[in-house]
Every structure is written in structure tokens, then in C-alpha cells.
Amino acid sequence: MSRIGKKPVVIPSGVTINVAAGNKVEVKGAKATLSKTFSTDVTFSVADNVATITLNNNSKNAVAQSGTARAILSNMVEGVSKGFERKLKIIGVGYRAKAQGNELNLTLGFSHPVVYKLPQGITAETPAPTEIILKGADKELLGKVASEIREYRKPEPYKGKGVRYEDEYVAKKEAKKK
């Protein structure tokens, strides 16, 4: 087994894990309910507020799947109990964002505003016109949404204008001189 796959997942109070046929795991908590179907190379067992993962065979793929399954299960448990948050910053003259219900209106220097429809389970806040805070229980979906929003206007290397993650560092280039 992998190092990560050997570690048990501690289940906090208020969170329940159900393992159904076909390795479908459902995690219920205060914030949300998440479900995912895992590889048949691993088996889940839940006892005494601890979930453990065991291998069905010792193939290289099964060993890799054990670590992946444990990490995903841990993220699901944390997501339904605490939730995840991703912050984006918008840098550029006239660049701004505004959250309206399940849509995010972005003005990013195009001739038209960009309207991004948020998927179910993800919420957006704009405490300032140049800040976006995305929240959700599903870490994978949250990262995908943040990546798609960033993709509209990636930070450019000369002035740094664009949409970036809050903790992202953009290496700046010097302009060409004649």
C-alpha cells in the first residue's frame, strides 16, 4: 500500500459515510452530501468514526488507487464538514467582477461582459470589485471552476493584468528595448 493509502480517515461528528454496491461512497455532512464511485481495486470499511482503505490485489494500479482514494475521501469528509474556499484577484484597469445569484459577471477588457454560470454546489462572493471568493464542498469542482474563471484572462507577464489565484506569483518580464 502507498504511504497515504495506509493512513485512516478520521470521521468528525455530524458526518456519515455510506458504502454502497459498486464502490459508490456517499458522504453526508452539515454543509452538503457528496458521492463518488471509486475503483474496484480498493475496498472501504467504516468503524468507530474511522474509515480505512484495503487493497483487493497488489497490482501497481491498486497501490496507486489506494492513495488516491484515501486523499479524495479525506477531501470529501473535510468538504461536507468545513467546506473549501478559493480566492481570485483581478488586476487591470477597468477589470471587475460582480456576483449575482448563481452567475458571475466579469468585465475583463473584452467588448462584452463575460457571464459565468456557477455550477450547483459552488457559491461566489465579491467583497470588492477586484476580489472573488468561491466556496463549496467539492474540492475538485471548486478548483475546476476557479481554473475556468482564470482561463478567461490569464495574468500576462508584462504588466501582470488578468485573473489570478490569491497566492499565485506571476513572474514579470522586461519589455523589449530598441
Curated annotation (Swiss-Prot):
<dbReference type="GO" id="GO:0002181">
    <property type="term" value="P:cytoplasmic translation"/>
</dbReference>
<keyword id="KW-0687">Ribonucleoprotein</keyword>
<dbReference type="GO" id="GO:0003735">
    <property type="term" value="F:structural constituent of ribosome"/>
</dbReference>
<dbReference type="Pfam" id="PF00347">
    <property type="entry name" value="Ribosomal_L6"/>
</dbReference>
<comment type="similarity">
    <text>Belongs to the universal ribosomal protein uL6 family.</text>
</comment>
<dbReference type="InterPro" id="IPR002358">
    <property type="entry name" value="Ribosomal_uL6_CS"/>
</dbReference>
<keyword id="KW-0699">rRNA-binding</keyword>
<keyword id="KW-0694">RNA-binding</keyword>
<dbReference type="GO" id="GO:0022625">
    <property type="term" value="C:cytosolic large ribosomal subunit"/>
</dbReference>
<protein>
    <recommendedName>
        <fullName>Large ribosomal subunit protein uL6</fullName>
    </recommendedName>
</protein>
<comment type="subunit">
    <text>Part of the 50S ribosomal subunit.</text>
</comment>
<dbReference type="GO" id="GO:0019843">
    <property type="term" value="F:rRNA binding"/>
</dbReference>
<dbReference type="InterPro" id="IPR019906">
    <property type="entry name" value="Ribosomal_uL6_bac-type"/>
</dbReference>
<dbReference type="InterPro" id="IPR036789">
    <property type="entry name" value="Ribosomal_uL6-like_a/b-dom_sf"/>
</dbReference>
<keyword id="KW-0689">Ribosomal protein</keyword>
<dbReference type="InterPro" id="IPR020040">
    <property type="entry name" value="Ribosomal_uL6_a/b-dom"/>
</dbReference>
<dbReference type="InterPro" id="IPR000702">
    <property type="entry name" value="Ribosomal_uL6-like"/>
</dbReference>
<comment type="function">
    <text>This protein binds to the 23S rRNA, and is important in its secondary structure. It is located near the subunit interface in the base of the L7/L12 stalk, and near the tRNA binding site of the peptidyltransferase center.</text>
</comment>
